[in-house]
Amino acid sequence: MGSFNRRKFLLTSAATATGALFLKGCAGNPPDPNAASTGTNPSPQAAGDISPEMMPETANIKLGYIPIVEAAPLIIAQEKGFFAKYGMTGVEVSKQANWASARDNVTIGSQGGGIDGGQWQMPMPHLITEGIITNGNKVPMYVLAQLITQGNGIAVAPMHEGKGVNLDITKAADYIKGFNKTNGRKFKAAHTFPNVNQDFWIRYWFAAGGVDPDTDIDLLAVPPAETVQGMRNGTMDAFSTGDPWPYRIVTENIGYMAGLTAQIWPYHPEEYLAIRADWVDKNPKATKALLKGIMEAQQWIDDPKNRPEVVQIVSGRNYFNVPTTILESPFKGQYTMGDGQPAIDDFQKGPLYWKDGIGNVSYPYKSHDLWFLTESIRWGFHKNAIPDLDTAQKIIDKVNREDLWREAATEAGFTADIPSSTSRGVETFFDGITFDPANPSAYLQSLAIKKV
């Protein structure tokens, strides 16, 4: 299994086994025992006027999703007929029980009863391509679009209120690092899947405040149900989580929000659409048709007047199966932070899907892939498979298919929104650190806490 050993593989599967389902359980709805395989039936809508040269090779594909706000473009493209508009009338959007299940299902593909692709934390497509998290089984994948920016945050248990454990934890670093001296255990934090987005966000937050997430605290992959219960009873201290969890955690007095990822890295890359390379290579026109449908869905979602309908659709029984009240505030960019912090009421700090304050959200910048793999190197993840930045760049060039995104956007008439470069340029984090994709080694050198 390379750097992802069998024990960690099994622990990860167990740790994420109830991740998506707990959202339903906490809302008062019993978890669906068939959640890993439930999904929508192929759309019955007829395709619009499509020229022969753009007619998809197939109308059928099975896309997996996790019931969190990152999945909205897939769901809306299906429900509002954007997939069907471009000839993809046989799309099945299939709920996955957790990230481990999605990983396993894409490995076997839809013909084996799995999925062809769908929604992914980064850099899962790269890791699956290299066989790093699939027991050495290399399944080439293509990253095709970014689904969303923002929509995540760091939750903290109420026992730490008033201790300075907020966005900037510099002054609370000694309190966190010395927690074992007064409490008989280290400060404990959790995420739902290792070495990907939510792990990276909480690691960056700790390290920016002078806390080493590998030595000063216990950082674990833990199911949300267990994590939230731990926050209630005082055995879990922090949690890297995504919408609608920030809303729930504060309103249900489970804890408070130390900060949003929108504050840690404004307009950061989040989750992506990625599909098996063999499917894309066989069906390039269908791939672009999917992309066009998702692009239209992203634009539709980002119109504030459509957000109430977005909430109605994604909260429905076929998808998230939660009360609409749980999703209304996050989709407005409204967050009650707790611990005496001012509330946030800013549409630009909530989940965005097509445009943000920098440019296009949907376009899969190679520079963002590079940050995810550079961060992997920073923390010493997958040393054998990704030993250096040159290897990382080669993997990105193999996996990232921004060229297909450009072609699809051009064919759909979205030329004004096509970025001029595969790099978004220099990125700036809340602690003043910058990441220049033209010089990622300088970023690594600038970091005080790292494993390289």
From Swiss-Prot:
Keywords: Cell inner membrane, Cell membrane, Ion transport, Membrane, Signal, Transport
Membrane topology listed for this record: Peripheral membrane protein
InterPro entries: NrtA/CpmA_ABC-bd_dom, TAT_signal
DNA-binding keyword on record: no
Membrane-crossing segments per the record: none
Secretion signal span: 1-35
Subunit structure: The complex is composed of two ATP-binding proteins (CmpC and CmpD), a transmembrane protein (CmpB) and a solute-binding protein (CmpA).
Name this protein carries in UniProt: Bicarbonate-binding protein CmpA
Native source organism of the sequence: Synechocystis sp. (strain ATCC 27184 / PCC 6803 / Kazusa)
Higher taxonomy: Bacteria, Bacillati, Cyanobacteriota, Cyanophyceae, Synechococcales
